[in-house]
UniProtKB/Swiss-Prot annotation:
Enzyme Commission code: 7.1.1.-
Purpose of the protein: NDH shuttles electrons from NAD(P)H:plastoquinone, via FMN and iron-sulfur (Fe-S) centers, to quinones in the photosynthetic chain and possibly in a chloroplast respiratory chain. The immediate electron acceptor for the enzyme in this species is believed to be plastoquinone. Couples the redox reaction to proton translocation, and thus conserves the redox energy in a proton gradient.
Domain of life: Eukaryota
Name of protein: NAD(P)H-quinone oxidoreductase subunit 2 A, chloroplastic
Assembly: NDH is composed of at least 16 different subunits, 5 of which are encoded in the nucleus.
Transmembrane stretches, start-end: 24-44, 57-77, 99-119, 124-144, 149-169, 183-203, 227-247, 289-309, 326-346, 354-374, 385-405, 426-446, 449-469, 515-535
Pfam families according to UniProt: Ndh2_N, Proton_antipo_M
A molecular-function term among this protein's GO annotations: quinone binding
GO cellular component: chloroplast thylakoid membrane
Subcellular location: Plastid, Chloroplast thylakoid membrane
GO biological process, one term: photosynthesis, light reaction
Organismal lineage: Eukaryota, Viridiplantae, Streptophyta, Embryophyta, Tracheophyta
Residues spanning the signal sequence: none
UniProt source species: Coffea arabica (Arabian coffee)
Catalytic activities: a plastoquinone + NADH + (n+1) H(+)(in) = a plastoquinol + NAD(+) + n H(+)(out); a plastoquinone + NADPH + (n+1) H(+)(in) = a plastoquinol + NADP(+) + n H(+)(out)
Length: 541
């Protein structure tokens, strides 16, 4: 009898939970329509993979690419709508969150064609790779709109778990396994630290978990200036710092960038660029280390975009009364990142490690925008620079992936004389590097100029001066690589470039298509900055 009553209660409770979930999905589902498109793409990809023994490779690439494009379209149609909070306060939609979601979708859309040839050459499992990329993208999008501590914790964990799996995707390589283990252990530790910081805020606010309700709770409990808030600020800054990878939370970045590699005997002739079944180009893959993988390109931009969106909301809302404290912490992180990242990048011999330390320096510039905040167009300048950084960084990685597939090396010295063999690739890489360094009239120059100007207007004079000096340092090591690219002296040209197969002037493989898009986006937008700045300013909440 007791068991029967308990069973009935369980059924009633389950029914209530199901009906509440159905009610939320029915009335609030339209607010996460872009995310629902990605979920549908994931399910469709799984169904096709499980129902067919013979994999239709063009369809496997077509489904996630179409899902991402449709999700971007849905976001654009929803632009300028009124901000809304849905799912009982767990999720918020506004222009500010949506522009970061757009940036994440843009990264993923460019990274999928970037990975086509690499996956074919290394003969990795295609479906699982695409599933991990889509799921990580979904986690990043939910993180951008997260409005409570539970969602802020679960969404990045979804992203992080897929990142761990992607970084260790080449599981037969020892270096890849070592990098993944470091990434996993440090990620788990940082998540624990982040949750501990959340617990301090939860207790101090009287048991609130929504961001705005935490502020109201701190006012009601008179705890907004208590030592507990300072402790929470330190722990949360450390936890978010791992995702942003500023110094001194950067140790995992160069190891993961360099550790993602693969060594395998590959057939000498492959049909590549079959993402939509259009192009067939003969390709030769060597038994060499093919590096860096598109995984690194994906992780280098999406994690920073998602973490930046989360950091701005967490610091600006719950820590509204502790602005001086988190400003000081972020200023220290920005200075350390800009100095250490750019100085250590000079000494690197691997392109991947150089880009890893360069990205640490770049996040220092982004932090300036977070510190400036909404008052002096700080967020607008951060969004603008993020957009340019995506194109500059992915364009650089596209060039390096292409060179790695053709030569099997990523040593900086092995790029010597590339211009004599492949002027198009050398020129594309040079433009992306110059834009990363911030040379006029490229997009990177105007992005940094706008960011530094907003910082100067906000009174961050020392931070801006450090940024200017470290930008000059970054130009040095970028120009050092460009000088190698353009050299014509035979004694400096390595066998990798001597044996380089000259590509046709008009090649139609997907890596070059992605590379062209990124190179154009790294150069032309610098000429017409006003529309981009206006859109970024319009996105502020």
């Amino acid at each position: 009898m007791i068991w029967h009553v308990q069973n009935e209660n369980f059924i009633l409770d389950s029914t209530r939970i199901f009906m509440k979930a159905f009610h939320l999905l029915l009335f609030d589902g339209s607010l996460i329509f872009p995310e629902c498109i990605l979920i549908f793409g994931l399910i469709l990809l799984l169904m096709i993979d499980s129902s067919s023994d013979q994999k239709d490779i063009p369809w496997l690439y077509f489904i996630p690419s179409t899902s991402l494009v449709m999700s971007i379209t849905a976001l654009l149609f929803r632009w300028r709508e009124e901000p809304m909070i849905s799912f009982s306060g767990n999720f918020q939609t506004n222009n500010f969150n949506e522009i970061f979601q757009f940036l994440i979708l843009l990264c993923s859309t460019l990274c999928i064609p970037l990975s086509v040839e690499y996956i074919e050459c290394t003969e990795m499992a295609i479906t699982e790779f695409l599933l991990f990329v889509l799921t990580a993208t979904l986690g990043g999008m939910f993180l951008c709109g997260a409005n409570d501590f539970i969602t802020i914790f679960v969404a990045p964990e979804c992203f992080s778990l897929c990142s761990y799996l992607l970084s260790g995707y080449t599981k037969k390589d020892v270096r890849s396994n070592e990098a993944t283990m470091k990434y996993l252990l440090m990620g788990g530790a940082s998540s624990s630290i982040l949750v501990h910081g959340f617990s301090w805020l939860y207790g101090s606010s009287g048991g609130e978990i929504e961001l705005q309700e935490i502020v109201n709770g701190l006012i009601n409990t008179q705890m907004y200036n208590s030592p507990g808030i300072s402790i929470a600020l330190i722990f949360i800054t450390v936890g978010i710092g791992f995702k942003l990878s500023p110094a001194p939370s950067h140790q995992w970045t160069p190891d993961v960038y360099e550790g993602v590699r693969f060594v395998r005997e590959i057939p000498t002739s492959l049909s590549i660029s079959e993402m939509f079944g259009f192009f067939k180009t003969p390709w030769t893959c060597r038994r060499e280390i093919l590096s860096p993988t598109p995984v690194v390109a994906f992780l280098s931009v999406t994690s920073k975009v998602a973490a930046s969106a989360s950091a701005t909301r967490i610091f600006d809302i719950p820590f509204y009364f502790s602005s001086n404290g988190w400003h000081l912490l972020l200023e220290i992180l920005a200075i350390l990142s800009m100095i250490l990242g750019n100085l250590i990048a000079i000494t690197q011999t691997s392109m991947k490690r150089m880009l890893a330390y360069s990205s640490i320096g770049q996040i220092g510039y982004v932090i300036i925008g977070i510190i400036v905040g909404d008052s002096n167009d700080g967020y607008a300048s951060m969004i603008t620079y993020m957009l340019f950084y995506i194109s500059m960084n992915l364009g650089t990685f596209a060039c390096i992936v292409l060179f790695g597939l053709r030569t099997g090396t990523d040593n900086i010295r092995d790029y010597a004389g590339l211009y004599t063999k492949d002027p198009f690739l050398a020129l594309s890489l040079a433009l992306c590097l110059l834009s990363l360094g911030g040379l006029p009239p490229l997009a990177g120059f105007f992005g940094k100029l706008y960011l530094f100007w907003c910082g100067w207007q906000a009174g961050l004079y020392f931070l801006v001066l450090i940024g200017l000096l470290t930008s000059v340092v970054s130009i040095y090591y970028y120009l050092k690589i460009i000088k190698l690219l353009m050299t014509g002296r035979n004694q400096e040209i390595t066998p990798h470039v001597r044996n380089y197969r000259r590509s046709p002037l008009r090649s139609n493989n997907s890596i070059e298509l992605s590379m062209i898009v990124c190179v154009i986006a790294s150069t032309i937008p610098g000429i017409s900055m006003n529309p981009i700045i206006a859109i970024a300013q319009d996105s502020l909440f």
